[in-house]
Amino acid sequence: MSAAATMAPVSLRIHAIAYGADDVLLFDLRAPARDGLAPFDAGAHIDLRLPRGITRSYSLLNDPAERHRYVIGVKREPESRGGSAWLHADARVGALIEVDGPSNHFALDESAPHAVFIAGGIGITPLWSMVQRLEHLGTPWTLHYRARSRRGAALLDELAGHGDRVHLSFSDEGAPSLDLAAIVAAAPEGAHFYCCGPVPMLEAFEAACVGLDPARVHLEYFAAKEAPATEGGFVVHLARSGRTIPIAAGCTILDALQAGGVAVPSSCQQGVCGICETAVLAGVPDHRDLVLSDQERAAGRTMMICCSGSKTAELTLDL
């Protein structure tokens, strides 16, 4: 089930910036007055409000038992539109950043008898938080971690102390791609499976888990799986303001609202972060996101307006 943040943003200070791997920096964020931070569960993320109106979501990688800090890993992306590029080039220790959250669309099932984690690249970050939580609970787990190289793999030092529960695989060393079907087949009975990484890995993971109880399969996308709905041809009624916005072909609902001067929080523009989640009061959404569960999609009570459209000629939103 989706979990949208409902708290007001807080100002956190960058306490430390550390090297995580090639093109990966680790940011330690703390409250300026040394106040305790809002608690979070393993798998959660926070939303950073950055300069130029940019909001970006980053997974929390530290132990959920910690109440004094949030730690995120930020990979510099070549195609960055300002999020990771600004954090790598301009963020400084001591600076304040507005933060929303935590929120969690990738929750750990703590009742499972065993957890199997599959990480690709920077996708290790939420899974490392889950590992730390399971260590406190005494629940057995295994981790399969694939990256292009050791230099580009984050958290290797932290993982080194966990012995044969951690299986590393690096493409530049000639290691074959992870055999996800074999990993799933070899897992203990009742195990839950978690995957976070690039789209091809996630699609292969979903294929390997076909036939399993969906409640045992958990995944988080960092990028869109399908194209946004830009067919247009419908209108959106804004219940609070009384405005009606036509959605033309070639733009999303979010595009049209922003062009009309309607301020709506957003970040990824791909339907993976959940920031733009909006309540639907009437009409049938055409869901294209990777946040809502199948049950939530069927209910049609909420949608991600950055990527989803409408199956009906009119859609009424709680805006």
UniProtKB/Swiss-Prot annotation:
<dbReference type="GO" id="GO:0016491">
    <property type="term" value="F:oxidoreductase activity"/>
</dbReference>
<keyword id="KW-0813">Transport</keyword>
<dbReference type="InterPro" id="IPR012675">
    <property type="entry name" value="Beta-grasp_dom_sf"/>
</dbReference>
<dbReference type="InterPro" id="IPR001041">
    <property type="entry name" value="2Fe-2S_ferredoxin-type"/>
</dbReference>
<dbReference type="InterPro" id="IPR036010">
    <property type="entry name" value="2Fe-2S_ferredoxin-like_sf"/>
</dbReference>
<keyword id="KW-0001">2Fe-2S</keyword>
<keyword id="KW-0411">Iron-sulfur</keyword>
<feature type="domain" description="2Fe-2S ferredoxin-type">
    <location>
        <begin position="234"/>
        <end position="319"/>
    </location>
</feature>
<feature type="domain" description="FAD-binding FR-type">
    <location>
        <begin position="7"/>
        <end position="109"/>
    </location>
</feature>
<feature type="binding site">
    <location>
        <position position="273"/>
    </location>
    <ligand>
        <name>[2Fe-2S] cluster</name>
    </ligand>
</feature>
<dbReference type="GO" id="GO:0009056">
    <property type="term" value="P:catabolic process"/>
</dbReference>
<dbReference type="InterPro" id="IPR039261">
    <property type="entry name" value="FNR_nucleotide-bd"/>
</dbReference>
<dbReference type="InterPro" id="IPR017938">
    <property type="entry name" value="Riboflavin_synthase-like_b-brl"/>
</dbReference>
<dbReference type="GO" id="GO:0046872">
    <property type="term" value="F:metal ion binding"/>
</dbReference>
<feature type="binding site">
    <location>
        <position position="276"/>
    </location>
    <ligand>
        <name>[2Fe-2S] cluster</name>
    </ligand>
</feature>
<dbReference type="InterPro" id="IPR006058">
    <property type="entry name" value="2Fe2S_fd_BS"/>
</dbReference>
<dbReference type="InterPro" id="IPR050415">
    <property type="entry name" value="MRET"/>
</dbReference>
<comment type="similarity">
    <text>Belongs to the PDR/VanB family.</text>
</comment>
<dbReference type="Pfam" id="PF00111">
    <property type="entry name" value="Fer2"/>
</dbReference>
<comment type="function">
    <text>Degrades exclusively diarylether compounds having carboxyl groups in the 3- or 4-position. Yields a hemiacetal that spontaneously hydrolyzes to phenol and protocatechuate.</text>
</comment>
<keyword id="KW-0288">FMN</keyword>
<dbReference type="GO" id="GO:0051537">
    <property type="term" value="F:2 iron, 2 sulfur cluster binding"/>
</dbReference>
<dbReference type="Pfam" id="PF00970">
    <property type="entry name" value="FAD_binding_6"/>
</dbReference>
<feature type="binding site">
    <location>
        <position position="268"/>
    </location>
    <ligand>
        <name>[2Fe-2S] cluster</name>
    </ligand>
</feature>
<comment type="subunit">
    <text>This dioxygenase system consists of two proteins: the alpha subunit (PobA) and a subunit (PobB) that acts as a ferredoxin and a ferredoxin reductase.</text>
</comment>
<keyword id="KW-0408">Iron</keyword>
<feature type="binding site">
    <location>
        <begin position="113"/>
        <end position="223"/>
    </location>
    <ligand>
        <name>NAD(+)</name>
    </ligand>
</feature>
<keyword id="KW-0249">Electron transport</keyword>
<keyword id="KW-0614">Plasmid</keyword>
<keyword id="KW-0058">Aromatic hydrocarbons catabolism</keyword>
<feature type="binding site">
    <location>
        <position position="306"/>
    </location>
    <ligand>
        <name>[2Fe-2S] cluster</name>
    </ligand>
</feature>
<protein>
    <recommendedName>
        <fullName>Phenoxybenzoate dioxygenase subunit beta</fullName>
        <ecNumber>1.-.-.-</ecNumber>
    </recommendedName>
</protein>
<keyword id="KW-0520">NAD</keyword>
<keyword id="KW-0560">Oxidoreductase</keyword>
<keyword id="KW-0479">Metal-binding</keyword>
<dbReference type="InterPro" id="IPR008333">
    <property type="entry name" value="Cbr1-like_FAD-bd_dom"/>
</dbReference>
<dbReference type="InterPro" id="IPR017927">
    <property type="entry name" value="FAD-bd_FR_type"/>
</dbReference>
<comment type="pathway">
    <text>Aromatic compound metabolism; carboxydiphenyl ether degradation.</text>
</comment>
<keyword id="KW-0285">Flavoprotein</keyword>
